[in-house]
Amino acid sequence: MATKKNTRKRRVKKNIESGVAHIHSTFNNTLVMITDPQGNAVAWSSAGALGFKGSRKSTPFAAQMASEAAAKAAMEHGMKNVEVAVKGPGSGREAAIRALQATGLEVSAIRDVTPVPHNGSRPPKRRRV
């Protein structure tokens, strides 16, 4: 039985001028994915992927760091301006948008794409602290 050689695909530098930054901010984490206009992923990051654990993942600072990491990776592919699509009720929404602007990406539009149920499934019970 021959051993299979582990060949890893090299990351190709794409030349993409503009794209869409999808910020998914939940109560527990913030995910930032930057795609080309067709929706193909260029770069992504999250608070958990950067080493934040537990309740620290849900902070605005963790969202800011995740946003900066994704923006730097996207700028390596030649990205200059992005549209921002924000989804979810988390605390890191505004911090992530501000971090994208601070890294040098030009934000052309901000859209809120949070899904709103037309009376779908029953929500989780209220917390009693």
Swiss-Prot record:
UniProt-listed GO biological process terms: translation
Superkingdom of source: Bacteria
Gene Ontology terms for molecular function: rRNA binding; structural constituent of ribosome
Family annotation (InterPro entries): Ribosomal_uS11, Ribosomal_uS11_bac-type, Ribosomal_uS11_CS, Ribosomal_uS11_sf
UniProt signal peptide: none
Keywords carried by this UniProt record: Ribonucleoprotein, Ribosomal protein, RNA-binding, rRNA-binding
Keyword Repeat: no
GO cellular component, one term: ribonucleoprotein complex
Purpose: Located on the platform of the 30S subunit, it bridges several disparate RNA helices of the 16S rRNA. Forms part of the Shine-Dalgarno cleft in the 70S ribosome.
NCBIfam families: PRK05309.1, uS11_bact
Family named by the database record: Belongs to the universal ribosomal protein uS11 family.
Subunit structure: Part of the 30S ribosomal subunit. Interacts with proteins S7 and S18. Binds to IF-3.
Protein name per Swiss-Prot or TrEMBL: Small ribosomal subunit protein uS11
